[in-house]
Amino acid sequence: MANPKSLSLFLLSLLAIASAEVFFEERFEDGWENRWVKSDWKKDENTAGEWNYTSGKWNGDPNDKGIQTSEDYRFYAISAEFPEFSNKDKTLVFQFSVKHEQKLDCGGGYMKLLSSSTDQKKFGGDTPYSIMFGPDICGYSTKKVHAILNYNDTNHLIKKEVPCETDQLTHVYTLVIRPDATYSILIDNVEKQTGSLYTDWDLLPPKKIKDPEAKKPEDWDEKEYIPDPEDKKPEGYDDIPKEIPDPDAKKPEDWDDEEDGEWTAPTIANPEYKGPWKPKKIKNPNYKGKWKAPMIDNPDFKDDPEIYVYPNLKYVGIELWQVKSGTLFDNVLICNDPEYAKQLAEETWGKNKDAEKAAFEEAEKKKEEEESKDDPADSDADEDDDDADDTEGEDDGESKSDAAEDSAEDVHDEL
């Protein structure tokens, strides 16, 4: 028989989920193209990438599709509209899933929440945004979750490091911002970071600052150790020579004093010599520690009880530059209920993750088998010709690849 208390909690949970306010939910089912607008950004430069509608090369459900970047060295910009709302007095939950099938070297997997002033056809890298959230990978140095909040027209990066997932499987990223100015970041329904908007972003000036008028007192002693005034230099200390004749040295048998002069033994370092005498150190009884200016209220600080509020959210978008394409987005959610978001994640990612992992492992196994079939001995006869051809194209290929990677890092550094 079910525990009455557990049953009550379960019913309360269902009631809470049923009352969740969903502002936007996109599972990329039929008709998704009517809900999403592809931007004209970068089209004139022929560097705008196209999206594929697919479940990917490996998946847990071939019918669960999303949109995937399909062209290398391209910019991507696409957005969807929802009824304008403010999160004042509400919890804001922003969640989506992303999979880097291409084993991403440098590129983003983040999404943006945009205000009502956004022009979807012009949406691009310079378009102001309210929130930018999601994974970002570039080389060995950058493998983190971005959580960038716009406050007073300035973008503020989170000060804490939140590592992102770097494999080739689907992962769910969730950002929760609450009316009490606290937040949580989850990956695959597991909380990875939590804290306060006040402390983990520099949205406001600090409440306290060092007193600029404070001066260190003249008698403030910062020396932790001092020479021992009772310590005395031993008698004869200064008479100890730095070097002494080598006691093991022997006069050569063929040494002729008349011809070679009087023989003297070479000198060696004196093990008794201790250098210039210094009194030993003792704890300073007057030590007060390192002086610090006292903290005072910052006259420039003004609290904002609505620091968490975004008053006119109306669009969600993806804006990326990718050297290597293959990133797949799915199951985008904007709501006010973290429990509903968790449920959606379990219904989609959670239901399919094991099957997806098995499909990926099978694909990797087949790939290894295909590669092992290639016998290097079969190509020995053509090796010289191939080397000549490779040499001719090597410089051009490498320079093109290097230029593209440098461009990717430049774009990444502008974030």
UniProtKB/Swiss-Prot annotation:
GO CC: one term?
A: endoplasmic reticulum lumen
Where does it primarily localize? endoplasmic reticulum
Biased composition (Basic and acidic residues) is annotated at 208-253, 347-376
Output this protein's name. Calreticulin
Q: Where is this region: 3 X approximate repeats?
A: 261-299
Entry annotated with the keyword Repeat: yes
User: What are the annotated glycosylation sites?
Assistant: 52, 152
Q: Where does each sequence repeat begin and end?
A: 192-203, 211-222, 228-239, 246-257, 261-271, 275-285, 289-299
Q: Which organism is it from?
A: Ricinus communis
Which InterPro entries does this one have?
Calret/calnex, Calret/calnex_CS, Calreticulin, Calreticulin/calnexin_P_dom_sf, ConA-like_dom_sf
Highest taxon, organism lineage? Eukaryota
- Signal peptide, first to last residue: 1-20
Region annotated 4 X approximate repeats sits at 192-257
GO annotation, biological process: protein folding
Enumerate the subcellular locations listed in this protein's record, separating them with semicolons. Endoplasmic reticulum lumen
